[in-house]
């Protein structure tokens, strides 16, 4: 086995180890994971896969493709803990394959591996890959689209890849509306082609060019056409409101007039310099090198870097911003960085910077662990609200172990191999988080602990209704639970809940979020305080506790 093959096996071993460890060891956590998992679970149970539901209401915030994936895996495995995380794992591995293979085709196999390592070791990429949000799947579709379009433009013509690139962008669009940004890659490609850069052709005069847009429309139509036919033929106002919300308010209106997550225009620069560590540490050496490559008219750098810049601009325009919005740009940045990394890592200053990062990260983790073990800091008390005391001890030892291992790695590998110390420290971080941290945090973060206590309090034969609920309560309930709407005003939910309870007063209970305060009509002497979960206090009410409510 030659060295490149050994390095390839080593990369994929670490990728599987880092990304797959912990699969099946936790439940969905807020804010988004329980929502998608609940929708997927209800799809399997109800058989209605076309119109997602959150409890009794239609869920129109996102297209259903991601939830379809979770639901299909739940149907196949019968295990929610595995099914809800598996799409993110598969998408992350697919993204790594795209970037490593593209690097190998445009440069060498070793350059492809550097692109893979730069993507895998970026903190935000791995953090998102170990969560069950939509973003890892969107990143995969966008990266697959860029992969196919770049191969067509730089190594083509290949109209099969051209169609694949457009189709992947379409599937990204029906996963999350922003999937269409993959097609922005054609703008720098067109500029390079029009200016006569060597080896760049879009082949726009070929009649087969139009197969690409057709593939995009066909991919979007997989969901859009049957949804529109069913919704408009249904005749119900709820379904027409669903169409208006998902096609207009959640896309065009949300982009043009964001109603939450307000951030300044430079927010994503901060994200790049923090969440994209340690990869961002190479930028001081990469930027001058990129400038030299662009002067030489090397389109392998212009097209991905131009697209990354367009993605940053696109997401910086609206006021609403979240850190994961620009994650799709990371693989192409890593691709453009990869040919430069061997030279950068040979620089003594780059190794010193990496070593400084390892030492700073390790000392911070060790300090946090020791502070939790030896003191009683305010951040610990706030963090541990609603959790058992043993969780704090376990997390403290986890932080201390990560910090100690990182310091040991820095001493072992030294200044000249700081990149190896970095890989060792981050691997230890993700393994310990997956095997120790996540299971310890699970009961409090997922509402499993709360709902287990609720089930024990009301007994196996009782019925449960939820008021002011969050998705994790309905998902983790040990029995079918009644809900009275999700977006409705809590006072209206409570009034309907009381009426529901009175039809079988001895068997029905209400779980109510305290919010700004329980209704004054409740008999607090009869109400059961179920403690804090996910930062909210919950009360369990029997019919006697709500007797004075109308």
Give the predicted meaning of each segment.
Residues 2-5, 163, 255, 289-550:
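Membrane-embedded architecture of ER/inner-membrane glycosylation machinery
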